[in-house]
């Protein structure tokens, strides 16, 4: 997935805590170096999260995922959803350092959750993934910004 390509931006969407009455805001912004996911997290009205998402398919045999990103020092989650368990979110934490970094994620790093709580779920396989996203939550408030350049399966 090439986040420097403007067509990628068109295929992404935002899901914030306003789906549950929260007041957090976020947006996606095009940039030649890569797409920005940025906004403001508020815990008012029981809120406290923002996410961007996109449909994706990984090839059979994918062993890990690599994300090239430039961040703000905050904690994010790379989230995956599958066709086998569409209501389950598989999440792997990372701190987005304020310089270009390649973050590598293998299957063992992803924990199954439902609305942020750990649950038992089918075993994750990258070949079952239909949606990917970046989530910021976990009690963090205030402004955030992460720039995404590429996401690759290896």
Regions found by a protein language model. Give the residues of each.
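Beta-rich carbohydrate-recognition modules and glycan-binding surfaces
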Residues: 1-154
């Amino acid at each position: 997935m090439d986040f420097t390509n403007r067509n990628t931006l068109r295929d992404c969407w935002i899901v914030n805590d306003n789906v549950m009455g929260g007041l957090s805001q976020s947006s996606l912004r095009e940039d030649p170096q890569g797409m920005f996911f940025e906004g403001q997290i508020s815990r008012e009205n029981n809120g406290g999260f923002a996410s961007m998402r996109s449909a994706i398919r990984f090839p059979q045999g994918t062993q890990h995922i690599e994300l090239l990103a430039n961040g703000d020092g905050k904690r994010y989650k790379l989230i995956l959803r599958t066709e086998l368990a569409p209501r389950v979110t598989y999440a792997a934490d990372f701190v987005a350092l304020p310089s270009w970094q390649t973050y590598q994620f293998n299957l063992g790093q992803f924990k199954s959750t439902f609305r942020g709580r750990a649950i038992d779920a089918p075993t994750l396989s990258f070949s079952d993934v239909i949606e990917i996203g970046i989530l910021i939550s976990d009690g963090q408030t205030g402004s955030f910004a992460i720039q995404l350049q590429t996401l690759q399966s290896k």
